[in-house]
Amino acid sequence: MDHKPLLQERPPAYNLEAGQGDYACGPHGYGAIPTAPPPPPYPYLVTGIPTSHPRVYNIHSRTVTRYPANSIVVVGGCPVCRVGVLEYCFTCLGIFLAIVLFPFGFLCCFALRKRRCPNCGAVFT
């Protein structure tokens, strides 16, 4: 393999004048971005004696009613310690009736359950 430099000639200069090089614009600006037309003149108001009365603004004050902050109520929260969440537990009588009266005993079992707080141990019927 030959180790020859890839470019034999020097690259073109960056400061090209009009009419030189492949990418330069022609003498008439062919390919150049046209300039935008100037914006229309701003309509100025004629100063003089005002023909209408000055505006009057009425400022009305409103009364602001402040409500107390809402308290967060946890559904199923313990009313005694306010930390634990109440869990359902079945009573011994409910479990006994569920076994003895098999198909209909489940109704008795669910009717005889209690709510218990695992944090403070309070029991609610």
From Swiss-Prot:
Induction: Up-regulated during TNF-mediated inflammation and immunity.
Organism domain of life: Eukaryota
Broad class of the protein's primary localization: membrane
Subcellular location: Lysosome membrane; Cytoplasm, Perinuclear region
InterPro entries for this protein: BRI3
A GO molecular-function descriptor: identical protein binding
GO cellular component terms, A-Z: lysosomal membrane; perinuclear region of cytoplasm
Membrane topology of this protein: Multi-pass membrane protein
TM helices/strands, residue ranges: 71-91, 92-112
Keywords: Cytoplasm, Lysosome, Membrane, Transmembrane, Transmembrane helix
Entry comment describing in which tissues the protein is expressed: High expression in cerebral cortex, and in cerebellar cortex.
Cystine pairings recorded for this chain: none
Subunit structure: Interacts with BRI3BP. Interacts with MGAT1 and IFITM3.
Family: Belongs to the BRI3 family.
Function: Participates in tumor necrosis factor-alpha (TNF)-induced cell death. May be a target of Wnt/beta-catenin signaling in the liver.
Protein name: Membrane protein BRI3
Species of origin: Mus musculus (Mouse)
